[in-house]
């Protein structure tokens, strides 16, 4: 389907706006994935706060110019599915990683975080805000438990020495 100039400009502006406010980006090749599976992926992306769009490569290159994701321009070859995480940096990478496990034809091409290419696997393992808070609380809780154990051990050592 041929796009006229206004449609192309609208797509570039839409993707550029999504890229400007995004925390991270992931590029994938969805060739060979069934329509039902892609529909499911789109639904999951909306729920996770991920902007996802299939874009022509030249339009994608223009859209990311001047953003943190200009480093992705070399990965825009073949069918390009681009996703921008808006709420959590690892959301798109985690979504694509899980989807790739179920669909062997789905291939993650690249991921970018803070203006640099990064491994999608690493990006997918970033904890969410709630997970990070929980980990911090566990560390703080363990630190106080460790302090208690050391205090009790010191008291025991004092009693043994006396």
Curated annotation (Swiss-Prot):
Assigned keywords, A-Z: Ribonucleoprotein, Ribosomal protein, RNA-binding, rRNA-binding
> Which InterPro entries has this protein been placed in?
Ribosomal_uL10, Ribosomal_uL10-like_sf, Ribosomal_uL10_bac, Ribosomal_uL10_bac_type
- What GO molecular-function term can you cite, just one? large ribosomal subunit rRNA binding
Under the cellular component aspect of Gene Ontology, which terms does the record hold? ribonucleoprotein complex; ribosome
Q: What's one Pfam family the UniProt record gives for this protein?
A: Ribosomal_L10
Superkingdom of origin: Bacteria
GO biological process terms, alphabetically, are: translation
The entry assigns this protein to a family as follows:
Belongs to the universal ribosomal protein uL10 family.
PANTHER family, per database record: 39S RIBOSOMAL PROTEIN L10, MITOCHONDRIAL (PTHR11560)
Q: Which HAMAP family match?
A: Ribosomal_uL10
Q: What does this chain do?
A: Forms part of the ribosomal stalk, playing a central role in the interaction of the ribosome with GTP-bound translation factors.
Query: What is said about its interaction partners and assembly?
Result: Part of the ribosomal stalk of the 50S ribosomal subunit. The N-terminus interacts with L11 and the large rRNA to form the base of the stalk. The C-terminus forms an elongated spine to which L12 dimers bind in a sequential fashion forming a multimeric L10(L12)X complex.
Q: Which NCBIfam families match?
A: PRK00099.1-1
Q: What is this protein called?
A: Large ribosomal subunit protein uL10
Natural source organism: Vibrio parahaemolyticus serotype O3:K6 (strain RIMD 2210633)
What is the name of the gene encoding this protein?
A: rplJ
């Amino acid at each position: 389907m041929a796009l006229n100039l206004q449609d192309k400009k609208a797509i570039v502006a839409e993707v550029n706006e999504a890229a400007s406010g995004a925390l991270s980006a992931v590029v994938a090749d969805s060739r060979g994935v069934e329509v039902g599976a892609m529909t499911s992926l789109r639904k999951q992306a909306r729920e996770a706060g991920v902007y996802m769009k299939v874009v022509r490569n030249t339009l994608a290159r223009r859209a990311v110019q001047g953003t943190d994701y200009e480093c992705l321009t070399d990965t825009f070859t073949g069918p390009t599915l681009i996703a921008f995480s808006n709420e959590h940096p690892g959301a798109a990478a985690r979504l694509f990683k899980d989807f790739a496990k179920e669909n062997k034809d789905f291939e993650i091409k690249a991921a970018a975080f803070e203006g640099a290419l990064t491994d999608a696997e690493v990006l997918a393992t970033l904890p969410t805000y709630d997970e990070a808070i929980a980990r911090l609380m566990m560390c703080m809780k363990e630190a106080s438990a460790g302090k208690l154990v050391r205090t009790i051990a010191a008291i025991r050592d004092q009693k043994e020495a006396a």
